[in-house]
Amino acid sequence: MNEQVLIKALVEHAYLEGDFVLRSGRRSRYYLDKYRFETVPELLGALGERLAIAVAEHEPEVARLAAPELGAVALAAAASLASQLPFLIVRKEAKGYGTSNRLEGVSESGELVCLIEDVVTSGGAALQAVETVREAGLVCRTAICVVDREEGGSDELARHGVRLWPLFRASDLLGQVKSVVNPHG
């Protein structure tokens, strides 16, 4: 799936207009519903391939991927299959039973990990995942997301030593929305 076709598919499946409160607490007139694109096999497969390519380009020495639950796990699994890199699931909090781990999967201290994210707004969820990964003795200096909403998340991650590489920016998708609504400019 080429870039323009993928952008169009993301807009068609995930772009919603209305009055939304985002995880960051901010209000928005639009919402990118990650579950609407992560649950479509054709889109998930195409995104997994693009994420794997981006990981190889921006963090070629990486040992494994990591993804915050729940939203980015399907993306990390798709990228893992495409890249053959193992991945970790980063829990928001330790479960109260079993291993009580915040990181699910196997890793060794000192390994280089690349964070996979879905939609980044303020960077809060990504930063929490990076902190969890680092507390486990792993190195994380790169995050790759499907969409950067361009609302400060990249800068916030940079302040903590993490470079964000988006597959797409909100402006890419919003430009597609405008062309669908008014195709003649």
Predicted regions and their residues:
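PRPP-associated nucleotide enzymes
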Residues: 1-116, 120-185
